Amino acid sequence: MKARLITRFKDVTPEGGVIELVVWRVTEPISPSEHGFKYRAAYAIDGVRLVGFDNERSKGDHCHMRGSERRYTFVSVEQLIEDFIAAVDAERAKT
């Protein structure tokens, strides 16, 4: 499977958290996802993932929020970025 990098972002927050997002365009969907993107996005502090979005093979599109996993409906790369930023902002507001 050939992949082309669409975007990559990584930042360290003042409190030491790491925010990272990577999206690739793939030639074939990552089953069971039906779109042509492979992605991973995570917000972690001290190595503990608090927020994550990805489409791991066999699991499809899903997100992680403080250890719980739920389905995620992928609409577009732009919407993924908005949803990820909103989830990170909500998590950072808790601390």
Regions found by a protein language model. Give the residues of each.
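The feature represents the first ordered module of a protein
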Residues: 1-62
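Short, compact, well-ordered microdomains
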Residues: 68-95
